[in-house]
UniProtKB/Swiss-Prot annotation:
This is ATP-dependent DNA helicase hus2/rqh1. One of its GO terms (molecular function) is ATP hydrolysis activity. ATP-dependent 3'-5' DNA-helicase. Has a role in the repair of UV-induced DNA damage in G2 via recombination-mediated repair. Also has a role in the repair of infrared-induced double DNA strand breaks. Disruption phenotype: Increased sensitivity to UV light. GO terms for biological process: DNA damage response; DNA double-strand break processing; DNA replication; double-strand break repair via homologous recombination; maintenance of rDNA; mitotic intra-S DNA damage checkpoint signaling; mitotic recombination-dependent replication fork processing; postreplication repair. Residues 1260-1269 have a biased composition (Polar residues). ATP binds at residues 555-562. Pfam families: DEAD, Helicase_C, HRDC, RecQ_Zn_bind, RQC. Belongs to the helicase family. RecQ subfamily.
Amino acid sequence: MTVTKTNLNRHLDWFFRESPQKIENVTSPIKTLDFVKVKVSSSDIVVKDSIPHKSKNVFDDFDDGYAIDLTEEHQSSSLNNLKWKDVEGPNILKPIKKIAVPASESEEDFDDVDEEMLRAAEMEVFQSCQPLAVNTADTTVSHSTSSSNVPRSLNKIHDPSRFIKDNDVENRIHVSSASKVASISNTSKPNPIVSENPISATSVSIEIPIKPKELSNNLPFPRLNNNNTNNNNDNNAIEKRDSASPTPSSVSSQISIDFSTWPHQNLLQYLDILRDEKSEISDRIIEVMERYPFSSRFKEWIPKRDILSQKISSVLEVLSNNNNSNNNNGNNGTVPNAKTFFTPPSSITQQVPFPSTIIPESTVKENSTRPYVNSHLVANDKITATPFHSEAVVSPLQSNIRNSDIAEFDEFDIDDADFTFNTTDPINDESGASSDVVVIDDEEDDIENRPLNQALKASKAAVSNASLLQSSSLDRPLLGEMKDKNHKVLMPSLDDPMLSYPWSKEVLGCLKHKFHLKGFRKNQLEAINGTLSGKDVFILMPTGGGKSLCYQLPAVIEGGASRGVTLVISPLLSLMQDQLDHLRKLNIPSLPLSGEQPADERRQVISFLMAKNVLVKLLYVTPEGLASNGAITRVLKSLYERKLLARIVIDEAHCVSHWGHDFRPDYKQLGLLRDRYQGIPFMALTATANEIVKKDIINTLRMENCLELKSSFNRPNLFYEIKPKKDLYTELYRFISNGHLHESGIIYCLSRTSCEQVAAKLRNDYGLKAWHYHAGLEKVERQRIQNEWQSGSYKIIVATIAFGMGVDKGDVRFVIHHSFPKSLEGYYQETGRAGRDGKPAHCIMFYSYKDHVTFQKLIMSGDGDAETKERQRQMLRQVIQFCENKTDCRRKQVLAYFGENFDKVHCRKGCDICCEEATYIKQDMTEFSLQAIKLLKSISGKATLLQLMDIFRGSKSAKIVENGWDRLEGAGVGKLLNRGDSERLFHHLVSEGVFVEKVEANRRGFVSAYVVPGRQTIINSVLAGKRRIILDVKESSSKPDTSSRSLSRSKTLPALREYQLKSTTASVDCSIGTREVDEIYDSQMPPVKPSLIHSRNKIDLEELSGQKFMSEYEIDVMTRCLKDLKLLRSNLMAIDDSRVSSYFTDSVLLSMAKKLPRNVKELKEIHGVSNEKAVNLGPKFLQVIQKFIDEKEQNLEGTELDPSLQSLDTDYPIDTNALSLDHEQGFSDDSDSVYEPSSPIEEGDEEVDGQRKDILNFMNSQSLTQTGSVPKRKSTSYTRPSKSYRHKRGSTSYSRKRKYSTSQKDSRKTSKSANTSFIHPMVKQNYR
């Protein structure tokens, strides 16, 4: 017997009552789970026993070997042997009548009932119910036995006289098929209901389940008739009448439901049911399609889902009409003139049985207990076959609840975990993150209209003999302090110290009416009060925590210690534009000042800021523009002198720190603003900073004694997983196709070429909706792809790591790293772009140790001193340690890096380690490590880490035998270990500093990493036995010899904080914070042939690092250009049948690919290019090079460097005097001067109103990045107008090609300041 939508509730009830052990050998009739239900203020409270936690997917509890089977293919379920004649009906229906199921009918017949007809009968009763008083158990609601009082829609279908006998004590209207009966009971007893509009014209009674006797006697509700003397006779009568019932298919098409006559509250309840059923059917369809692709069972659910969609549309239309009408009927919000019917298509209802009316348990509980709820959040909840009743409330009865009733009500088990609050996104940060929420209760919220809240308020009032709480009051909490799984909810009080500031009422008003939010998340209110008090504030919040609101809301407050313009320094134009778009929708005057704007727009912005009445609230600039632009400096000076500079905000503040993973030199100069604008409060915000980075930010920005606010970094909805990088595309497709085909995701790659290859492979070979996104694309194309992805046309975006920082998309369900990231900070930030809506999301990293060579090459070719590069290597080693760790919880490792203690018990299988069932033990690998050290010492020449490991394992490869390495002492010792443990051992020795990998380039420009001994002090500690090398190995792995000792599995995690070079699996500390730069060799242990190891090909290194810094993008361009140049050379050689010497050698082509000469003259400057070859062969090769020159120029067009403010030729700030304290610019040296804000602008002034209108109109027309509709580009060539900034500087060429020619040349002349970023600042923000 297969579980279906119609009988799933029976199976669930029976399954949780009987254990799996009882299922197989069941011989007695199965007793279903009792449902105990009582009505309190017309809200159904359901209490059940032995029901799993509601957040758990009920399908997870089913065992394939026992009862439940969801497909047609598997017919081994033990339920196949059960007979429904032995199954007792649910006790919930006993007071009136059980659903009689003929014993002769099969389960398949039971599934074929026309559920639409049953729903119509039920809903006819539902809509005919006026808002009633609360009905207790043991009493039946009744009005008349006359058949003329039967609902009209049922009279159209059935003749009640065929079923009703005048002398029956209980009369019923039966709508039945061959295998199922729906009964609507009527009694002849009078109705003792207290109501203003009692129902007297309807011969219908409502089936209400029994409440236990001990409670029902105390509640002041009418009673149900519990006379069951005629039950047996009625059952027999029902079975006899089945044959006389019309078939479902013959009547389905005649049923139409007039939703316009329903009470408003009933419509809301019914809408929740429809949405829940549609969601469940959709989940079922997707599950069957993906898990059982050869089954066609899902097809029968598609028409059901379509009918539900039509019903939802009909109900929403009525609700919309109700909202637009003047309804004074309380909860009975009907629209007499609105005729909105739903008639199910006969073709559909005849083919497919409609699902039964079943209500998820959580929906019943939510509708009766939750102050604020979204029905769509209910998914995969346990469902129960619960008849639906009106939730309308008659308020006079609320005051009749007595103290004894309250005590008995408290016996019900209402789990705090069932209270959920849908928190609205506080500006760019999606809802649902694990953070605290302060919910503001006011008269316009619908919280107070929930029946259970009113009952609870009345109950508390009865106990305390106090009056009911008023819905408009902020003085007391409604339900006090409540906790659920994700949020700690605090109702604010005006007596609360956080709301006792002079500006508190203005803050609450702006939150509601300006930003349309209902509350604050954790630390938001504290940050707002801090900055409005004139304090410096440092905010550390995870992605999705609501950082932007902390400075956007204070910007519109007039009552703070400072008022005027809030200066926001943001690193990315896309991030700026995203916030500006949101502020524009809120009508908050906010403007950018960037080189991306046309000159006339920049002049307009400056005019708004220099006006007498400055109405601009937020001004967004980039750090590069602030450091190099005199115009911005003059504007800020004017605002400061007029007391109109409110605060300075540094977004993404981790860019300030040298220790940060994304250091920007221009951010380092922001500390000078402290001297220039004395008395102005600073605010620094970041989502990724450990303790060292935080202290560096505070010291650099001179924010001593600032208010520090830190939220938890934990993202409980993210699942972390690391997979080996083997059979990558198969693994990618397997993951995406297993439940993620229709979901949005990001795949991060290391280079632009990888992005294109991965996207093309997934799109062409696997049919996935994937597209690449990177800086090599034209700006218009990038905008189009991003918009298509955000709208859902593309499900997967394959991009480089910068993508996603400025993208506001909360429903990203997975983030995949094609290669491991450069730091744990970067990993946390990139994975944080998934699941910002609070729903579960998956984070996967494909790990291969050899990928680190690419990062080593970038570090080697990058700018910065030895200390800077060593810090980069430290961050890289930490990522390797994180990936190699097989025992410690992933979440715990990440949070430990940020200095947050986390118990892995709370991970709840939220990572691959916690889901791992394998047993790991600690193995002492010190003896093996000593043999590896001796082996490396005895090797003459260069060897990679892989070659050293092969020698250690006794490999007999040709190169090893040729060099005689197989005869060295220690060769073959590692045979006792399996290869996986050997690899992890050598990687562990590298992370511990015992071995060091030295990256070098060969003559052809290819980079290799050769292994050499590390610091002598570390090696000596291992040789002396002071440092033990401990490795986690699977218990089934090959064991070392008896000399190794086994340790118990570690229960603690060594800290990752403070950049200590320690292994997460080792028991030793190796602090790097106080360590000097490693010397590769020490005099106490000289290499056998140091000249060979130290030797470098200096010419090749100079060729490779002719520029002191080459970004990842530039290396990618160089590689592709070199490939095309070699291809051209091969074609020319084939035509002329000549040798390489007749053309350009590989080294010459490499220089051409790096320098990208534009003409023959520049080509001649390359070493090895003769005049003859330059003239004869140069034009052909220059045509290939020109393509890459154009690409780089297009890429520079979207950079955040402001070309119109100084020059595109500057990568770093050259005019450092722009931030100096010179008296000529009018700044005072008086450090004791007090900065006082200006007076607020008076509202109502015509000039002010006109200027505000001009600013808002300008905001709607400004074109920083054109995030709206993407314009069509007429031509790829572009010519600047004659009044461009280059014309003012006397440039002789205005063509776009010429515009970037100087930039192309001078970009090689980078500053000598340390830059720890792997990606060049000029191209970083668009290198996606």
